[in-house]
Amino acid sequence: MFNTAKKILIMAGGTGGHIFPALAIANELKKHSSNIQWLGSNLGMENNIIPKHNIKLHTVSSVGLRGKNVISLIKAPFLLSYATLQVIKIFLKFKPDVVLGMGGFTSGIGGLVAWVFKTTLVIHEQNSIPGTTNKILNKIATKTFQAFDDTFIRNATTSGNPIVFNPIEKQNNNKLNLLIIGGSLGSKPINEIVTQLNIDINIWHQTGKLHADTVKSQYKNSAVKVTAFITEMASAYAWADIVLCRAGAMTVSELMLSATSSILIPLPNSIDNHQFHNAKILSDNNAGILIEQKDLTIELLEGILLNINKNQIKQMSSNALKIAKPNAVKQIVDYLLVSD
């Protein structure tokens, strides 16, 4: 039976990759009248997002350590100490029964404080390669959830990524429909290649807000729909026969849940090259085609699109669905509400 009086602190901040999966869990927890509060950074996008969902937000001073200059590294111990004191104060005031960490700086500090306070610590890793924070916290966490198999060696349950996604039945298209997703800010290297496509297919290109007008003017193909954003991704996946995109954890999970075949171009400078490893999960299961950005050419891309057939697309789509984990939110929420 659920303990609806349980106080739960969710720790996630900085980027959408941490925030939106955590928010999916938080909104489900709220249905059970749980006492939910949020720990984030003072600089992350959570400051604009979380208050809109009627969740109390605590913020601490953000201190990133990877890729910083010497001066920043000298300041880091003092800033870390201050941030730790801020988190301790939050714990003493809220007295959480369980904390959920989604990775990133605030999750790291909060997770260590939870361990010191002997508070139940649950973590979730969204990528196939764990971030530094979760590598550390996995050793002390009460429970670890992972989106993909074999991310951690010990103490981990594969749940999938906690996203709210309701797939729509695929359309039956006569001509190949290619959906290109550039991410919220777009992807200039991908845009420069795909705008050269001059084959008889339908293209829907989500460019990001910075590139919509430029990309639209560069296309040779007249059957192109260019939009800065796509708000209804389920409809877009239903329209698409195949998607060309980066390999962020949420995108890969959506491809699985929507049973959509894909051409994946991992971001080459992603931390620990995690996008490559995310993409490899789909390609290893014959659910996607992996192309490194350095190898992407118009000739290669046109060759793939001209030679792929409906049966191959159907098989890739089926394979993607086979490795999907549609119950991640419920699985994690159930654990949070019944754990001691």
Curated annotation (Swiss-Prot):
Cited InterPro entries: GlcNAc_MurG, Glyco_trans_28_C, GlycoTrans_28_N
Alphabetically ordered keywords of this record: Cell cycle, Cell division, Cell inner membrane, Cell membrane, Cell shape, Cell wall biogenesis/degradation, Glycosyltransferase, Membrane, Peptidoglycan synthesis, Transferase
Catalytic activity field: di-trans,octa-cis-undecaprenyl diphospho-N-acetyl-alpha-D-muramoyl-L-alanyl-D-glutamyl-meso-2,6-diaminopimeloyl-D-alanyl-D-alanine + UDP-N-acetyl-alpha-D-glucosamine = di-trans,octa-cis-undecaprenyl diphospho-[N-acetyl-alpha-D-glucosaminyl-(1->4)]-N-acetyl-alpha-D-muramoyl-L-alanyl-D-glutamyl-meso-2,6-diaminopimeloyl-D-alanyl-D-alanine + UDP + H(+)
Biological process per Gene Ontology, one example term: regulation of cell shape
EC id: 2.4.1.227
Keyword Cell division set for record: yes
Topology class, membrane: Peripheral membrane protein
Pfam families documented for this protein: Glyco_tran_28_C (PF04101), Glyco_transf_28 (PF03033)
GO molecular function, a single term: undecaprenyldiphospho-muramoylpentapeptide beta-N-acetylglucosaminyltransferase activity
SUPFAM superfamilies reported for this sequence: UDP-Glycosyltransferase/glycogen phosphorylase (SSF53756)
Family: Belongs to the glycosyltransferase 28 family. MurG subfamily.
Role summary: Cell wall formation. Catalyzes the transfer of a GlcNAc subunit on undecaprenyl-pyrophosphoryl-MurNAc-pentapeptide (lipid intermediate I) to form undecaprenyl-pyrophosphoryl-MurNAc-(pentapeptide)GlcNAc (lipid intermediate II).
Protein's UniProt name: UDP-N-acetylglucosamine--N-acetylmuramyl-(pentapeptide) pyrophosphoryl-undecaprenol N-acetylglucosamine transferase
Gene: murG
